[in-house]
Curated annotation (Swiss-Prot):
Inhibits the formation of NO by neuronal nitric oxide synthase with an IC(50) of 26.4 uM. Keywords: Amidation, Amphibian defense peptide, Secreted. It comes from the Eukaryota. It is found in: Secreted. This is Signiferin-4.2.
């Protein structure tokens, strides 16, 4: 869902 996509985006930005 949207939460999963947002979590992936945050993970990508933080890495």
């Amino acid at each position: 869902g949207f939460a999963d996509l947002f979590g992936k985006a945050v993970d990508f930005i933080k890495s």
